[in-house]
Amino acid sequence: MAAFGINSKIFQSMEMAILFLLAISIDRYCFAADEDMLQDVCVADLHSKVKVNGFPCKTNFTAADFSSLAISKPGATNNKFGSVVTTANVEQVPGLNTLGVSLARIDYAPGGINPPHTHPRASEMVFVMEGELDVGFITTANVLVSKKIIKGEVFVFPRGLVHFQKNNGEVPAAVISAFNSQLPGTQSIPITLFGASPPVPDDVLAQTFQINTEDVQQIKSKFAPVKKF
């Protein structure tokens, strides 16, 4: 009986160890935004015609593939929203391919806004370099989580949730954004709905927002799709 008791305890310990290892494995995949790397480097071949989930590796690479000055200077904010996003993702820094990280810089004129949007492939953390911002995100239970953030402060936007930043100050503001994806993707809510190509049907938007089709057409005129040649 004693031997049976010892064997039973050993079995239980092994069972717990296996469950623990499984939990770690599951946890790793739950929190990873991108697939893990399988080699030291895989510099993206941005011109390859091969279609994969990500980018294929190019054979020859240099230090230039791992560096960029893209976010070193303020961007122009003279647009309808008074803000501009400058990215440093795999499309600007090919060496980021398979590494699961990227950055962006966002500049805001006084009164400027980065309209409600989502990043379907990444969570985002912003660090305020200059000015102050009113920021927030909305949960799937329609709860608004918001606050004013100041120079030197960070704020996190969970993956996939609608969020925004607004500069209500009298001076320009700027942040650096960090993402846990080499290419987080962005869907701006107003542009997605009212500037899609082909366009979202007027009756769909009218019924969704409880407005008439004339109002829909007026809003669409402000978000006309950019023609690509």
From Swiss-Prot:
Source species, domain of life: Eukaryota
InterPro entries linked to this entry: Cupin_1, Germin, Germin_Mn-BS, RmlC-like_jellyroll, RmlC_Cupin_sf
Instruction: List required co-factors.
Output: Mn(2+)
Give yes or no: UniProt keyword Transcription regulation. no
Q: What class of enzyme is it?
A: oxidoreductase
Report the leader peptide range. Answer: 1-32
Q: Which cysteines are joined by disulfide bonds?
A: 42-57
**Which tissues does the record link to its expression?**
Nectary tissues and to a lower level ovary. Not detected in petals, stems, leaves, roots or other floral tissues.
Question: What does the cofactor section's free text say about binding?
Answer: Binds 1 Mn(2+) ion per monomer.
Task: Name a GO CC annotation attached to this entry.
Answer: apoplast
Instruction: Tell me the GO molecular function terms.
Output: manganese ion binding; superoxide dismutase activity
Ranges for domain Cupin type-1 come to 69-217
Q: In which broad location class does this protein mainly occur, judging by the first location in its UniProt entry?
A: secreted
Binding positions for Mn(2+)? 117, 119, 124, 163
Q: Which reaction does it catalyse?
A: 2 superoxide + 2 H(+) = H2O2 + O2
This protein's assembly is summarised as:
Monomer. In the absence of manganese, it forms tetrameric and pentameric forms which show superoxide dismutase activity.
UniProt lists the family membership as follows:
Belongs to the germin family.
Q: What is this protein called?
A: Nectarin-1
Native species: Nicotiana langsdorffii x Nicotiana sanderae
Name of the gene: NECI
